[in-house]
């Protein structure tokens, strides 16, 4: 939100009680009817928020709910993002790991069924939890929705060649899901590296100063290798002005802070750790 600074990608709505009640009260329906009714229930839930007293919704929440209503009508949700200084990566629910192989994105962050307010979670969490609830009753229901956050790199750089690659990447996935007719888009032959959300690691600046970022985005870092230098100009004549920062584990650098000037505690880098091939 440009006024409040609130991240409205963390303002989506989820009512887990709706899932619990639905799983208890709709067991008599076949799979197709159950899925259709649940999709409508999700839309109605969002409508109830949008149609409530207008003074209860700020601008960010209203935008989020309107987007969510559109998304609940779909079977596939791709939330396209860019970051200040970032490599391409994909947020993928663990149940859809196989589908991640159809995007031409080398770095995949596998996320659990916990809801944390994001667009992709608002779409897959209800279906995932419904499937789990019905499984507890002895009924298997496939998860009807796939939702991903597709991080397309740095927002400060426009590269039309990369934009074409990104489009082909998305078309490859959509072709895999049989959205396209007579399409030839297929995934690139690349190695994809994955990391679980709990192993997605934020590295905070231990001191403030001017930063030279060394770890390349998308690059594999070995434990003990330099990731950045921090320069403290006021220490030039009295003590060591340059401090080299290292990481104590192997990692892949995914993004770093947008400025070369940081305070102590600034989120300097984010890394994949405990990496495995997908």
Spans of model-derived segments:
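Structured catalytic-domain cores with a bias toward divalent-metal coordination
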Residues: 1-278
